[in-house]
Amino acid sequence: MKKAVVFYSLSGNTQAAAKEIAEGIGADLIELKLVKPFPTEKSKQLALGGMQAMFGMKPAIQELSKNIKEYDVLILGTPIWAGTIAAPVHSFLNKYQVLDKIVAVFTFSDGGDNKRCIAKLSKRLPRLKVEVALANRDSDLAIHNADKIHHFIKEVKRLV
């Protein structure tokens, strides 16, 4: 069964976890990249990203580095913006026919809570079985991330 971890990362939190998870389950890594990148100024990133997420906007993403049709199983990684998935991930889900391939999701937020985001995703992802909420590295809750990622990897391995 061919597996891939598909993720978007603005600050590097999601990217670091994606690499660890892909390594742990023996999956390829596919990073989502915007055609027009976000501004480098943090306040502008927050304003634009939050607005895009709140209004369900779908910014253009670059072509993927690998052919997504070749994969049987996908693990999705996203930061949480305005209580939902990051806009580039929204673009990915709408552009590619992969909803039935996604079995696991990992999310990042300041508070480490993803319940609202996962509730929305569960309605769109019929095979979603495993999820984990991780805290951004600046958060006090980030000390639990390593254990959570390890447990997430074990759960995903049991599925695939």
Which residues fall in each region the model found?
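Alpha-helix boundary/capping detector
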Residues: 40, 47, 55, 101, ...
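Short, glycine-/small-residue-rich phosphate/pyrophosphate-handling segment
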Residues: 104-144
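Short, conserved loop/helix-junction motifs that constitute active-site signature segments
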Residues: 68, 94-101, 124-127
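N-terminal beta1-alpha1-beta2 submodule of the flavodoxin-like/Rossmannoid cofactor-binding fold
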Residues: 1-76, 83-85, 90, 94, ...
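Solvent-exposed loop/turn segments at secondary-structure junctions
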Residues: 11, 36, 81-83, 110-113, ...
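Redox-cofactor binding/interface segments in oxidoreductases and associated redox assembly factors
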Residues: 76-77, 105
